[in-house]
Amino acid sequence: MLNARDVCPEGNDDQQLDHNFKQMEEHLALMVEGNENEDPRKATCEYEDTNEDGATCTSGVLSEIQENFGRLRLCDVTAPLLEFHGLDCLQQIQKRSRHFAFDGSPAKKSRSGGVLVTGPKQKQLQKENVWNRKSKGSASADNIEKLPITIEKLHMIGLHGDCLEHNAVLRLMNLFRSLHDHLTADLGFSRQNSMPSDYLFDMPVKSTMPKSLNVRYQLQVLCTKVERFLVQQRRTLEANRHFDFEKYDECDKLLKGFASYLDNFKLLLKPKMRNRNGNSGSNADKFHTQRMERLLIGLRDWIKAAHLSVHVFNWEMDLEHRYSGAMTESHKSLNERAILLSGAELRAAEARGISAEDLFIAQRYKLGGPIYCVLEQHEFLSALIANPETYFPPSVVAICGPQKLGAVSMEQPSASEEEFEETEEVPSSPPRHTGRVPRFRS
Protein backbone atom coordinates (compact mmCIF):
# COMPACT_ATOMS: atom_id res chain seq x y z
CA MET A 1 0.00 0.00 0.00
CA LEU A 2 1.22 3.49 -0.84
CA ASN A 3 1.13 5.77 2.21
CA ALA A 4 2.35 9.35 2.19
CA ARG A 5 1.58 12.20 4.55
CA ASP A 6 -0.47 15.04 3.16
CA VAL A 7 1.57 18.13 3.95
CA CYS A 8 0.85 20.30 0.86
CA PRO A 9 -1.50 23.31 0.91
CA GLU A 10 -5.20 22.73 0.26
CA GLY A 11 -5.15 24.60 -3.06
CA ASN A 12 -2.67 22.20 -4.72
CA ASP A 13 -4.15 18.92 -3.34
CA ASP A 14 -6.78 18.43 -6.03
CA GLN A 15 -4.47 19.30 -8.89
CA GLN A 16 -1.75 17.01 -7.64
CA LEU A 17 -4.25 14.18 -7.13
CA ASP A 18 -5.59 14.51 -10.69
CA HIS A 19 -2.07 14.52 -12.07
CA ASN A 20 -1.20 11.32 -10.17
CA PHE A 21 -4.36 9.54 -11.34
CA LYS A 22 -3.60 10.41 -14.97
CA GLN A 23 -0.11 8.95 -14.69
CA MET A 24 -1.48 5.76 -13.14
CA GLU A 25 -4.14 5.37 -15.87
CA GLU A 26 -1.53 5.76 -18.60
CA HIS A 27 0.71 3.21 -16.95
CA LEU A 28 -2.16 0.70 -16.56
CA ALA A 29 -3.20 1.15 -20.20
CA LEU A 30 0.36 0.44 -21.36
CA MET A 31 0.51 -2.76 -19.28
CA VAL A 32 -2.87 -4.02 -20.58
CA GLU A 33 -1.84 -3.33 -24.20
CA GLY A 34 1.42 -5.17 -23.65
CA ASN A 35 -0.44 -8.27 -22.43
CA GLU A 36 -2.84 -8.19 -25.41
CA ASN A 37 0.02 -7.98 -27.98
CA GLU A 38 1.68 -11.17 -26.76
CA ASP A 39 2.18 -14.28 -28.89
CA PRO A 40 -1.24 -15.70 -29.89
CA ARG A 41 0.04 -19.24 -29.21
CA LYS A 42 0.29 -18.36 -25.58
CA ALA A 43 -3.14 -16.72 -25.48
CA THR A 44 -5.13 -19.37 -27.50
CA CYS A 45 -6.44 -22.48 -25.81
CA GLU A 46 -9.07 -25.12 -26.34
CA TYR A 47 -12.79 -24.49 -25.96
CA GLU A 48 -13.30 -26.85 -23.06
CA ASP A 49 -10.72 -25.00 -20.97
CA THR A 50 -11.82 -21.46 -21.77
CA ASN A 51 -13.05 -20.65 -18.25
CA GLU A 52 -9.89 -21.88 -16.58
CA ASP A 53 -7.61 -20.06 -19.07
CA GLY A 54 -9.59 -16.80 -18.72
CA ALA A 55 -9.25 -16.93 -14.98
CA THR A 56 -5.53 -17.73 -15.33
CA CYS A 57 -4.92 -14.79 -17.69
CA THR A 58 -6.90 -12.41 -15.48
CA SER A 59 -5.08 -13.56 -12.34
CA GLY A 60 -1.78 -13.12 -14.16
CA VAL A 61 -2.65 -9.54 -15.14
CA LEU A 62 -3.75 -8.71 -11.61
CA SER A 63 -0.63 -10.22 -10.06
CA GLU A 64 1.51 -8.15 -12.45
CA ILE A 65 -0.44 -5.01 -11.52
CA GLN A 66 0.12 -5.79 -7.87
CA GLU A 67 3.89 -6.16 -8.40
CA ASN A 68 4.04 -2.91 -10.40
CA PHE A 69 2.13 -1.05 -7.71
CA GLY A 70 4.60 -2.32 -5.15
CA ARG A 71 7.46 -0.79 -7.17
CA LEU A 72 5.54 2.37 -8.08
CA ARG A 73 6.77 5.61 -6.51
CA LEU A 74 5.15 8.96 -7.04
CA CYS A 75 7.20 11.84 -8.25
CA ASP A 76 5.91 14.24 -5.63
CA VAL A 77 6.60 13.34 -2.02
CA THR A 78 3.87 15.68 -0.82
CA ALA A 79 1.11 13.81 -2.67
CA PRO A 80 -2.04 12.88 -0.66
CA LEU A 81 -2.35 9.47 0.98
CA LEU A 82 -3.81 6.60 -1.09
CA GLU A 83 -4.84 3.21 0.32
CA PHE A 84 -5.34 -0.06 -1.58
CA HIS A 85 -7.06 -2.72 0.48
CA GLY A 86 -6.00 -6.31 0.09
CA LEU A 87 -2.49 -5.49 -1.15
CA ASP A 88 0.75 -6.19 0.71
CA CYS A 89 0.83 -2.84 2.46
CA LEU A 90 2.64 -1.85 5.60
CA GLN A 91 -0.58 -0.99 7.51
CA GLN A 92 -3.70 -2.98 6.68
CA ILE A 93 -7.03 -1.39 7.56
CA GLN A 94 -10.13 -3.40 8.43
CA LYS A 95 -12.27 -4.03 5.32
CA ARG A 96 -15.44 -5.79 4.35
CA SER A 97 -14.95 -9.39 3.40
CA ARG A 98 -16.87 -10.98 0.55
CA HIS A 99 -15.36 -14.46 0.69
CA PHE A 100 -15.89 -15.17 4.37
CA ALA A 101 -19.20 -15.45 6.16
CA PHE A 102 -20.09 -15.97 9.81
CA ASP A 103 -21.92 -18.99 11.26
CA GLY A 104 -21.01 -21.24 8.32
CA SER A 105 -23.08 -19.35 5.70
CA PRO A 106 -21.90 -19.75 2.06
CA ALA A 107 -19.47 -17.14 0.75
CA LYS A 108 -20.48 -14.78 -2.03
CA LYS A 109 -18.86 -15.11 -5.44
CA SER A 110 -16.88 -12.20 -6.79
CA ARG A 111 -17.85 -10.57 -10.07
CA SER A 112 -14.31 -10.17 -11.39
CA GLY A 113 -13.56 -13.88 -11.47
CA GLY A 114 -10.32 -13.37 -9.53
CA VAL A 115 -9.34 -11.91 -6.17
CA LEU A 116 -6.44 -9.78 -5.15
CA VAL A 117 -6.07 -11.75 -1.86
CA THR A 118 -6.23 -15.50 -1.67
CA GLY A 119 -8.85 -17.35 0.40
CA PRO A 120 -6.59 -18.52 3.27
CA LYS A 121 -5.16 -15.02 3.55
CA GLN A 122 -8.65 -13.50 3.77
CA LYS A 123 -9.68 -15.99 6.48
CA GLN A 124 -6.56 -15.24 8.45
CA LEU A 125 -7.16 -11.48 8.18
CA GLN A 126 -10.77 -11.82 9.25
CA LYS A 127 -9.82 -13.97 12.25
CA GLU A 128 -7.39 -11.26 13.26
CA ASN A 129 -10.15 -8.66 12.93
CA VAL A 130 -12.51 -10.71 15.13
CA TRP A 131 -9.78 -11.17 17.72
CA ASN A 132 -9.06 -7.42 17.67
CA ARG A 133 -12.74 -6.64 18.25
CA LYS A 134 -12.86 -8.99 21.24
CA SER A 135 -9.69 -7.54 22.75
CA LYS A 136 -11.03 -3.99 22.34
CA GLY A 137 -14.33 -5.00 23.95
CA SER A 138 -12.61 -6.61 26.95
CA ALA A 139 -10.36 -3.58 27.39
CA SER A 140 -13.35 -1.23 27.31
CA ALA A 141 -15.17 -3.45 29.87
CA ASP A 142 -12.17 -3.29 32.21
CA ASN A 143 -12.11 0.48 31.91
CA ILE A 144 -15.83 0.67 32.68
CA GLU A 145 -15.37 -1.45 35.82
CA LYS A 146 -12.69 0.90 37.09
CA LEU A 147 -14.90 3.96 36.70
CA PRO A 148 -16.70 5.16 39.87
CA ILE A 149 -20.46 4.75 40.31
CA THR A 150 -22.34 7.97 39.68
CA ILE A 151 -25.94 9.03 40.25
CA GLU A 152 -26.63 8.89 36.50
CA LYS A 153 -25.53 5.24 36.34
CA LEU A 154 -27.78 4.41 39.30
CA HIS A 155 -30.70 6.07 37.54
CA MET A 156 -29.99 4.00 34.41
CA ILE A 157 -30.47 0.73 36.34
CA GLY A 158 -33.56 1.97 38.19
CA LEU A 159 -32.03 3.03 41.52
CA HIS A 160 -32.90 6.49 42.77
CA GLY A 161 -31.61 8.48 45.72
CA ASP A 162 -29.35 6.53 48.06
CA CYS A 163 -30.01 3.13 46.44
CA LEU A 164 -33.56 2.89 47.81
CA GLU A 165 -36.54 1.30 46.15
CA HIS A 166 -38.08 3.53 43.48
CA ASN A 167 -41.61 2.73 44.62
CA ALA A 168 -42.50 4.97 47.57
CA VAL A 169 -45.10 2.55 48.98
CA LEU A 170 -42.58 -0.29 49.10
CA ARG A 171 -40.12 1.99 50.85
CA LEU A 172 -42.76 2.77 53.47
CA MET A 173 -43.48 -0.94 53.98
CA ASN A 174 -39.78 -1.60 54.54
CA LEU A 175 -39.67 1.18 57.14
CA PHE A 176 -42.75 -0.21 58.91
CA ARG A 177 -41.16 -3.66 58.96
CA SER A 178 -37.88 -2.38 60.40
CA LEU A 179 -39.66 -0.39 63.14
CA HIS A 180 -41.78 -3.38 64.18
CA ASP A 181 -38.71 -5.62 64.30
CA HIS A 182 -36.77 -3.00 66.27
CA LEU A 183 -39.50 -2.63 68.88
CA THR A 184 -40.12 -6.37 69.23
CA ALA A 185 -36.69 -7.96 68.87
CA ASP A 186 -34.17 -5.30 69.90
CA LEU A 187 -36.09 -3.44 72.62
CA GLY A 188 -38.10 -6.41 73.89
CA PHE A 189 -41.42 -4.57 73.56
CA SER A 190 -44.36 -6.74 72.53
CA ARG A 191 -47.90 -7.55 73.59
CA GLN A 192 -46.49 -9.69 76.39
CA ASN A 193 -45.27 -6.53 78.14
CA SER A 194 -48.37 -4.47 77.44
CA MET A 195 -51.08 -7.05 78.23
CA PRO A 196 -52.46 -7.63 81.76
CA SER A 197 -51.41 -10.81 83.53
CA ASP A 198 -54.93 -12.00 84.42
CA TYR A 199 -54.78 -14.99 82.10
CA LEU A 200 -51.59 -16.78 83.04
CA PHE A 201 -52.08 -19.75 80.75
CA ASP A 202 -53.07 -17.74 77.69
CA MET A 203 -49.80 -17.23 75.81
CA PRO A 204 -49.50 -13.74 74.30
CA VAL A 205 -49.53 -13.43 70.54
CA LYS A 206 -46.38 -12.02 68.98
CA SER A 207 -47.03 -8.50 67.73
CA THR A 208 -46.16 -8.51 64.05
CA MET A 209 -46.70 -6.15 61.17
CA PRO A 210 -50.20 -6.29 59.61
CA LYS A 211 -50.40 -7.93 56.21
CA SER A 212 -51.85 -5.03 54.27
CA LEU A 213 -50.82 -2.42 51.71
CA ASN A 214 -53.09 0.18 53.30
CA VAL A 215 -50.58 2.83 54.38
CA ARG A 216 -53.06 4.56 56.66
CA TYR A 217 -53.86 1.35 58.55
CA GLN A 218 -50.17 0.48 58.89
CA LEU A 219 -49.47 3.93 60.33
CA GLN A 220 -52.36 3.62 62.79
CA VAL A 221 -51.09 0.28 64.11
CA LEU A 222 -47.53 1.57 64.42
CA CYS A 223 -48.62 4.73 66.26
CA THR A 224 -50.59 2.65 68.77
CA LYS A 225 -47.59 0.44 69.40
CA VAL A 226 -45.20 3.37 69.77
CA GLU A 227 -47.60 5.10 72.19
CA ARG A 228 -47.61 1.99 74.40
CA PHE A 229 -43.84 1.93 74.27
CA LEU A 230 -43.75 5.59 75.29
CA VAL A 231 -46.10 4.89 78.23
CA GLN A 232 -43.82 2.07 79.39
CA GLN A 233 -40.78 4.36 79.29
CA ARG A 234 -42.70 7.04 81.19
CA ARG A 235 -43.67 4.52 83.89
CA THR A 236 -40.04 3.45 84.33
CA LEU A 237 -38.91 7.07 84.50
CA GLU A 238 -41.51 8.07 87.11
CA ALA A 239 -40.40 5.20 89.36
CA ASN A 240 -36.94 6.83 89.64
CA ARG A 241 -38.10 10.43 89.97
CA HIS A 242 -37.30 10.88 93.69
CA PHE A 243 -33.72 9.56 93.36
CA ASP A 244 -32.16 12.16 91.04
CA PHE A 245 -34.33 15.01 89.77
CA GLU A 246 -31.73 16.46 87.38
CA LYS A 247 -31.33 13.24 85.40
CA TYR A 248 -35.06 12.73 85.60
CA ASP A 249 -35.58 16.19 84.08
CA GLU A 250 -33.26 15.36 81.15
CA CYS A 251 -35.09 12.13 80.35
CA ASP A 252 -38.45 13.86 80.84
CA LYS A 253 -37.60 16.50 78.23
CA LEU A 254 -36.54 13.77 75.81
CA LEU A 255 -39.80 11.85 76.27
CA LYS A 256 -41.83 15.04 75.84
CA GLY A 257 -40.00 15.75 72.58
CA PHE A 258 -40.71 12.17 71.52
CA ALA A 259 -44.42 12.63 72.26
CA SER A 260 -44.58 15.92 70.33
CA TYR A 261 -42.81 14.27 67.36
CA LEU A 262 -45.35 11.46 67.49
CA ASP A 263 -48.19 14.00 67.19
CA ASN A 264 -47.04 14.75 63.62
CA PHE A 265 -48.26 11.31 62.54
CA LYS A 266 -51.78 12.09 63.73
CA LEU A 267 -52.01 14.75 61.03
CA LEU A 268 -51.16 12.10 58.43
CA LEU A 269 -53.99 9.86 59.62
CA LYS A 270 -56.60 12.29 58.25
CA PRO A 271 -55.91 11.93 54.48
CA LYS A 272 -56.70 8.53 52.98
CA MET A 273 -53.47 8.15 50.98
CA ARG A 274 -54.89 5.66 48.52
CA ASN A 275 -52.68 3.61 46.25
CA ARG A 276 -53.39 1.10 43.52
CA ASN A 277 -50.89 -1.76 43.26
CA GLY A 278 -48.33 0.29 45.16
CA ASN A 279 -48.68 3.43 43.04
CA SER A 280 -50.05 6.63 44.53
CA GLY A 281 -52.96 8.13 42.66
CA SER A 282 -52.75 11.90 43.09
CA ASN A 283 -49.98 14.37 43.73
CA ALA A 284 -51.30 15.00 47.25
CA ASP A 285 -50.95 11.29 48.07
CA LYS A 286 -47.38 11.32 46.76
CA PHE A 287 -46.58 14.36 48.90
CA HIS A 288 -48.03 12.74 52.05
CA THR A 289 -46.14 9.52 51.31
CA GLN A 290 -42.80 11.32 51.00
CA ARG A 291 -43.46 13.27 54.20
CA MET A 292 -44.35 10.08 56.06
CA GLU A 293 -41.12 8.46 54.87
CA ARG A 294 -39.05 11.31 56.31
CA LEU A 295 -40.96 11.19 59.60
CA LEU A 296 -40.54 7.41 59.95
CA ILE A 297 -36.78 7.69 59.48
CA GLY A 298 -36.69 10.28 62.27
CA LEU A 299 -39.00 8.17 64.47
CA ARG A 300 -36.45 5.37 64.52
CA ASP A 301 -33.83 7.72 65.99
CA TRP A 302 -36.27 9.03 68.61
CA ILE A 303 -37.12 5.49 69.74
CA LYS A 304 -33.45 4.56 70.13
CA ALA A 305 -32.58 7.75 72.03
CA ALA A 306 -35.55 7.50 74.43
CA HIS A 307 -34.99 3.84 75.24
CA LEU A 308 -31.25 4.29 75.79
CA SER A 309 -31.58 7.31 78.11
CA VAL A 310 -34.33 5.79 80.28
CA HIS A 311 -32.61 2.41 80.47
CA VAL A 312 -29.29 3.93 81.57
CA PHE A 313 -31.03 6.14 84.16
CA ASN A 314 -32.93 3.17 85.62
CA TRP A 315 -29.79 1.01 85.74
CA GLU A 316 -27.82 3.74 87.53
CA MET A 317 -30.55 4.27 90.14
CA ASP A 318 -30.72 0.52 90.76
CA LEU A 319 -27.01 0.41 91.51
CA GLU A 320 -27.05 3.44 93.78
CA HIS A 321 -30.32 3.19 95.72
CA ARG A 322 -32.27 -0.03 95.26
CA TYR A 323 -29.58 -2.45 96.41
CA SER A 324 -29.65 -2.55 100.23
CA GLY A 325 -26.63 -2.56 102.54
CA ALA A 326 -27.08 -6.27 103.31
CA MET A 327 -27.00 -7.12 99.60
CA THR A 328 -23.85 -5.04 99.16
CA GLU A 329 -22.12 -6.71 102.11
CA SER A 330 -23.13 -10.15 100.86
CA HIS A 331 -21.71 -9.32 97.45
CA LYS A 332 -18.44 -8.13 98.98
CA SER A 333 -18.15 -11.22 101.18
CA LEU A 334 -18.69 -13.47 98.18
CA ASN A 335 -15.93 -11.68 96.28
CA GLU A 336 -13.51 -11.93 99.21
CA ARG A 337 -14.29 -15.60 99.65
CA ALA A 338 -13.68 -16.29 95.98
CA ILE A 339 -10.34 -14.46 96.20
CA LEU A 340 -9.29 -16.53 99.23
CA LEU A 341 -10.25 -19.79 97.53
CA SER A 342 -8.34 -18.93 94.40
CA GLY A 343 -5.26 -18.03 96.47
CA ALA A 344 -5.48 -21.34 98.35
CA GLU A 345 -5.72 -23.27 95.10
CA LEU A 346 -2.67 -21.44 93.73
CA ARG A 347 -0.67 -22.28 96.84
CA ALA A 348 -1.82 -25.88 96.61
CA ALA A 349 -0.53 -26.10 93.04
CA GLU A 350 2.99 -25.14 94.13
CA ALA A 351 5.42 -28.00 94.89
CA ARG A 352 6.43 -28.27 98.55
CA GLY A 353 9.61 -29.73 99.91
CA ILE A 354 9.68 -32.37 102.69
CA SER A 355 11.09 -31.41 106.06
CA ALA A 356 13.66 -33.38 108.08
CA GLU A 357 11.06 -34.55 110.62
CA ASP A 358 8.72 -35.81 107.90
CA LEU A 359 11.61 -37.57 106.19
CA PHE A 360 12.67 -39.27 109.46
CA ILE A 361 9.10 -40.46 110.12
CA ALA A 362 8.76 -41.77 106.57
CA GLN A 363 12.01 -43.76 106.81
CA ARG A 364 11.54 -45.01 110.39
CA TYR A 365 7.90 -46.10 110.13
CA LYS A 366 7.82 -46.77 106.37
CA LEU A 367 5.10 -44.17 105.72
CA GLY A 368 6.67 -42.49 102.73
CA GLY A 369 3.63 -42.83 100.42
CA PRO A 370 1.02 -41.34 102.79
CA ILE A 371 3.33 -38.52 103.89
CA TYR A 372 4.17 -37.52 100.34
CA CYS A 373 0.45 -37.63 99.41
CA VAL A 374 -0.44 -35.42 102.39
CA LEU A 375 2.27 -32.94 101.45
CA GLU A 376 1.00 -32.72 97.87
CA GLN A 377 -2.63 -32.23 98.93
CA HIS A 378 -2.02 -30.20 102.09
CA GLU A 379 -3.42 -26.91 100.83
CA PHE A 380 -6.38 -28.56 99.16
CA LEU A 381 -7.24 -30.52 102.30
CA SER A 382 -6.94 -27.36 104.38
CA ALA A 383 -9.35 -25.53 102.06
CA LEU A 384 -11.68 -28.54 102.11
CA ILE A 385 -11.78 -28.61 105.92
CA ALA A 386 -12.21 -24.85 106.20
CA ASN A 387 -14.98 -24.58 103.60
CA PRO A 388 -16.65 -27.95 103.01
CA GLU A 389 -19.82 -26.38 101.57
CA THR A 390 -17.78 -25.20 98.58
CA TYR A 391 -16.88 -28.73 97.47
CA PHE A 392 -19.85 -30.79 98.77
CA PRO A 393 -23.62 -30.42 98.48
CA PRO A 394 -25.58 -29.29 101.58
CA SER A 395 -26.90 -32.80 102.26
CA VAL A 396 -23.38 -34.21 102.58
CA VAL A 397 -22.26 -31.28 104.72
CA ALA A 398 -25.21 -31.85 107.07
CA ILE A 399 -24.34 -35.54 107.47
CA CYS A 400 -20.64 -34.99 108.07
CA GLY A 401 -21.10 -31.86 110.17
CA PRO A 402 -20.33 -31.85 113.93
CA GLN A 403 -23.18 -32.81 116.29
CA LYS A 404 -24.37 -30.01 118.54
CA LEU A 405 -24.20 -31.00 122.24
CA GLY A 406 -27.15 -30.28 124.49
CA ALA A 407 -29.73 -30.23 121.77
CA VAL A 408 -33.23 -29.88 123.16
CA SER A 409 -36.15 -31.72 121.64
CA MET A 410 -39.26 -29.62 121.39
CA GLU A 411 -41.56 -32.67 121.54
CA GLN A 412 -40.48 -33.82 125.03
CA PRO A 413 -41.73 -31.61 127.86
CA SER A 414 -39.06 -30.22 130.13
CA ALA A 415 -38.83 -30.77 133.89
CA SER A 416 -39.31 -27.09 134.63
CA GLU A 417 -42.68 -27.15 132.90
CA GLU A 418 -43.76 -30.15 134.98
CA GLU A 419 -42.77 -28.39 138.22
CA PHE A 420 -44.63 -25.25 137.12
CA GLU A 421 -47.75 -27.28 136.50
CA GLU A 422 -47.55 -28.90 139.94
CA THR A 423 -46.97 -25.65 141.86
CA GLU A 424 -49.60 -23.63 140.00
CA GLU A 425 -51.38 -21.13 142.31
CA VAL A 426 -55.16 -21.21 142.79
CA PRO A 427 -56.87 -18.14 141.39
CA SER A 428 -58.27 -15.69 143.91
CA SER A 429 -61.58 -15.12 142.18
CA PRO A 430 -64.31 -17.75 142.45
CA PRO A 431 -65.09 -19.85 139.46
CA ARG A 432 -67.82 -18.72 137.12
CA HIS A 433 -71.08 -20.59 137.30
CA THR A 434 -72.71 -21.36 134.01
CA GLY A 435 -75.98 -22.65 135.49
CA ARG A 436 -79.23 -20.70 135.21
CA VAL A 437 -80.50 -18.98 138.37
CA PRO A 438 -84.32 -19.00 138.67
CA ARG A 439 -86.06 -15.73 139.23
CA PHE A 440 -89.23 -15.21 141.21
CA ARG A 441 -91.96 -13.12 139.79
CA SER A 442 -93.96 -10.82 142.05
Swiss-Prot record:
Start-end of Basic residues biased regions: 433-442
Residue stretches in coiled coil: none
Composition-biased stretches (Acidic residues): 416-425
PTM remark: Ubiquitinated (C-terminal region).
GO biological process, one term: germ-line stem cell division
Record-level Gene Ontology MF annotations: mRNA 3'-UTR binding; mRNA regulatory element binding translation repressor activity; ubiquitin binding
Protein location: Cytoplasm
Region (Required for interaction with ubiquitin): 201-250
Cellular component terms (Gene Ontology): cytoplasm; fusome; spectrosome
Phenotype upon changing residue 45 to S: In strain: Wpg6, Wpg8 and Wpg12
Main location per the UniProt record: cytoplasm
Keyword Amino-acid biosynthesis found: no
Segments for region (Disordered): 408-442
Tissue specificity note: In cystoblasts and/or very early cystocytes in testis (at protein level); expression levels are regulated by mei-P26. In cystoblasts and/or very early cystocytes in ovary. Expressed in the gut; expression levels increase with age.
Keywords, ordered alphabetically: Cell cycle, Cytoplasm, Developmental protein, Differentiation, Oogenesis, Spermatogenesis, Ubl conjugation, Ubl conjugation pathway
Conditions for induction: Induced by Traf6, possibly in response to activation of the IMD immune signaling pathway. Expression levels increase with age, possibly in response to inflammation induced activation of the IMD pathway.
UniProt free text on domains: May possess a C-terminal PEST sequence (rich in Pro, Glu, Ser and Thr) targeting it for degradation and rapid protein turnover.
The protein's role, per its UniProt record: Regulatory component of a deubiquitinase complex consisting of bam and otu. The complex deubiquitinates K63-linked polyubiquitinated proteins, antagonizing the ubiquitination activity of Traf6 and regulating the IMD immune signaling pathway. Otu-bam deubiquitinase activity is regulated by Traf6 dependent immune signaling regulation of bam expression levels; this forms a feedback loop that regulates the IMD immune signaling pathway and balances gut immune activity during aging. The complex deubiquitinates and stabilizes CycA/cyclin-A to regulate CycA-dependent differentiation.
Quaternary data: Interacts (via central region) with ubiquitin. Interacts (via C-terminus) with otu (via OTU domain); the interaction enhances otu aggregation into amyloid-like structures and enhances its deubiquitinase activity. Together with otu interacts with CycA/cyclin-A (via C-terminus); the interaction stabilizes CycA by promoting and enhancing otu dependent deubiquitination of CycA. Together with otu interacts with Traf6. Part of a complex composed of at least tut, bam and bgcn; complex formation does not require RNA.
The protein, known as: Protein bag of marbles
The organism of origin for this protein: Drosophila melanogaster
Protein's gene: bam
